[in-house]
Amino acid sequence: MESYLDRLEREKQHERNIYNSENILLTKNDLFSILDKSGMDYSKIEHKIHSMDISEFQIAFNHKSYCMYNIKISSELKEEAKSWKIPLQKVSNERYEFLGDSVIDLIIANYLFDRYPKEKEGFMTKLRTKLVCTKTLAKLSSYLNLTKFIVMSKYVEDMCEGRDNQKLLENCFESFVGVTYKLFGFDFCNDFILALIENVDLIDISDLIENDDNYKEQLLKYSHKFFEGRNPVYKQLSVEGQSNHAIFTMCVLVPVQADKLVIMAKAKGSIKKDAEQESARIALDKIKRNDFSAIE
């Protein structure tokens, strides 16, 4: 159990790792670059951007680890923070992230509804899941170079793969969309997202349709077919790091016999579902090679 002195030392170390020299604030020129990169036509609101205050767009990049309300720091550090290149922020991007998530879901659902008029609900649901998953949104975020403007603490950047963290990239894209929706409206957001989705160099929708990368579902079907309807079981083996930026180790137990569950694979990830998917993929690969051995 952590002692009081150990906790104090940990908190002091935490304080020393808040300031991040890599942080930069978004400018209007940066915003124009992002919109240019998207490939959309934004000429109708270009004049508005030139005259507007972009502080709300800057909020879209504020990670809570660099926000005053979310961290406990000494009065000395508070005073020191006033001289930082980018001071601690007042508001995080979480509210905009919440909004952007819903806007993206609606835009993609509407897009699929119109594009595939003869397809059933199940087809559209599966394809929407692939288009709004962490992997896809992180890819869009990286393509637009949003990661460059994330304002986060140094300890978070050091701990979670820096600006390549898939979850951070996904959240940043969602919050950027949330701000865009509030400032420019639904139609503008729709054009912005669809310009990215229909960029074949970014996303190949036909490939998403043809290739099933839901390994958990594949493993479930295989288990039902060959193991008398029994379900695989996913369990957490360990968790490393702080709760907000933890790395999870998940395993999958496959019911190779009626009374025998075998830990067939394990994988790590910053998101439990991703680690489960990867462990399912490894298990499927083993099964296809007739390897039903348990891992240590």
What are these regions (language model features)?
Residues 1-296:
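Double-stranded RNA-binding/processing signature
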